[in-house]
Design a protein with these regions (language model features):
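Mature N-terminal segment immediately following signal peptide/propeptide cleavage
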Residues: 1-3
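Extracellular parallel beta-helix/beta-solenoid repeat domains
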Residues: 5-22, 26-514
């Protein structure tokens, strides 16, 4: 990696417009990266290593650091980064007009473990089995390795996921465990995959940048998310593949992509997403609470998401941004404010803000969101299959989701919903969902298999969602109750969809239709 670091520095020095990386395999590693993976596998970071590795003060290694580059195209076709350890393989920070092409990111020791069922004895209870799993030779574990954070059983030949849970787990040796499992259709030969950590650093981190494009990039694995973008403007992903390495049925431990506090246009075009541990994309801003008042117009505010921001960097508004004041219980928007002054306080995980007119006398139960930092999202011609959570999750004020194919996703394929309890906002507006094909999604959970639009809060009665168009989609989910579910939308049009479910195909609750 030293040669690549020198090449980046030379590009900065010379002002070159193209950086060509010689095709081949490159080991990307560091002492902290190897130590982190060893600590996770030994159980030194506890049952949920995210609590240590996903914090603002956690120190980690960075591999290919492009920070500060501008007006550069990096050609990495035929280049494979083989990551040894838990780290951030690629960083794009404070960059402008940068395109990364052709790179593949994978891991020497995968950040998950794979095994196969060698014994499967039925119990008296329906679909409950005594199971023995033999892990692959290159997937040794210890007695304290986290094994039950997120896992999946699947047919080893077809790759079809099976809905099952581990009732009890017993470590046998570094390549075997036994378990009592409840799973429909589990049998000898089925494959078992499990991650050993949730969020950590992303494979590709885009931050504080403008006009960034990833083209023909592949991410096979990562102990965290695939691509994370934060506080950046105009990001395009063209033919991004977040898919397992050949022969595997797991890619990234959590989200394939995740974008927060973005501006401009965010476009995902002809991308492929398979077998990751969460949504294929989640686009949102953050709700923040007023923690201390200085005056009617000056206050300290703090982001309150359970896990912190998704890059573990402070979220804050810029001078001139618009803040929306929202009631947490029903997500009703009460007022808007212009930001006149901001002081960042990263060590205290808050910022001091002055706005253009007074806040209410009491801000108990109220939240502020920066609605200037919401991109227009385009998700066009992508395909997704066999992964956890939702396909698309949108909390923005403008989006087009068109001509995508989604199959066998655990939850609903497309969701537009603010989440008060997770402090991710805002309530969606101006969303068009058109011409998508959705097959057998939402089989594990969700109000509908295909498309869900709602406010996720305690009292969703405020009709804070508006201007929603759902048209010409094909949804086939014969085991699901509903195909489309919309709640609390002021201005919704549902037309021209073909929906095949066992129950009512389209459900609209408390909506005003066009």
């Amino acid at each position: 990696m030293q040669s690549l670091k020198k090449a980046v520095e030379q590009v900065k020095k010379d002002g070159a417009k193209t950086l060509f990386i010689e095709p081949g395999d490159y080991i990307v590693t560091g002492e902290r990266a190897r130590a982190a993976q060893s600590a996770v596998m030994a159980g030194d970071f506890g049952e949920n290593p995210q609590k240590i590795m996903f914090t603002p003060t956690y120190e980690y290694d960075i591999g290919f650091d492009l920070s500060g580059l501008s007006d550069v195209k990096i050609s990495a076709y035929g280049v494979r980064f083989i990551v040894d350890g838990f780290m951030e393989p690629v960083r794009i920070k404070n960059c402008e007009n940068v395109e990364l092409l052709g790179l593949t990111v994978t891991h020497k020791r995968k950040p998950f473990s794979r095994g196969h069922v060698t014994k499967c004895t039925p119990r008296n209870e329906e679909n409950v089995f005594d199971v023995t799993v033999e892990l692959d030779e290159d997937c040794p574990i210890t007695q304290k390795t986290p094994m039950l954070l997120r896992y999946m059983w699947c047919d080893a030949l077809s790759g079809k996921n099976k809905n099952g849970g581990i009732i009890s787990y017993t470590y046998v040796d570094e390549h075997h465990f036994t378990a009592v499992v409840k799973c429909i259709g589990l049998c000898v030969g089925d494959e078992f995959n499990t991650v050993h950590a949730f969020h950590s650093r992303p494979a590709i981190h885009i931050a504080e940048s403008k006009n960034i494009t990833l083209t023909d990039v592949t991410i096979n694995s990562q102990p965290g998310m695939g691509v994370v973008g934060n506080r950046s403007e105009n990001v395009t992903l063209k033919r991004l593949w977040v898919v397992p390495e050949c022969g595997y049925h797991w890619s990234t431990n959590t989200d394939a992509t995740h974008f927060t506090s973005m501006t401009g246009k965010l476009r995902l075009e002809n991308c492929v997403f398979e077998y990751h541990g969460d949504d294929f994309t989640n686009v949102h801003g953050y709700y923040q609470e007023v923690v201390t008042r200085v005056s009617d117009t000056e206050f300290f505010m703090q982001e309150k998401t359970p896990d912190g921001t998704h890059t573990q960097a402070l979220d804050y508004p810029d001078v001139g941004d618009t803040l929306e004041l929202t009631r947490k219980s029903d997500l009703r928007v009460l007022d808007t404010y212009k930001v006149e002054k901001v002081t960042l306080m990263p060590d205290e995980w808050m910022c001091r803000v002055t706005v253009d007119h007074p806040l209410p006398e009491s801000t108990e139960g109220l939240m502020l969101a920066d609605v200037t930092r919401l991109p227009f999202v385009e998700i066009i011609g992508c395909s997704a299959s066999s992964h956890f959570a939702r396909g698309v999750l949108l909390k923005t004020h403008g989006a087009l989701v068109e001509r995508n194919t989604m199959r066998d996703i655990h939850g609903p394929a497309i969701v537009a919903a603010s989440e008060a309890w997770w402090y991710e906002g805002v309530s969606p507006r101006n969303i068009t969902i058109r011409g998508n094909r959705i097959v057998n999604c939402g089989m594990f959970w969700g109000e509908a298999a295909g498309i869900v639009v709602k406010s996720d809060c305690d009292n969703p009665v405020s009709r804070n969602i508006s201007d929603i168009i759902i048209e010409d989609n094909v949804i086939e989910a014969p085991l699901a109750e509903h195909g489309i579910y919309v709640r609390g939308a002021d201005g919704v049009e549902v037309r021209g969809n073909i929906v095949k479910t066992r129950g009512e195909g389209v459900v609209l609750e408390d909506c005003v239709q066009y």
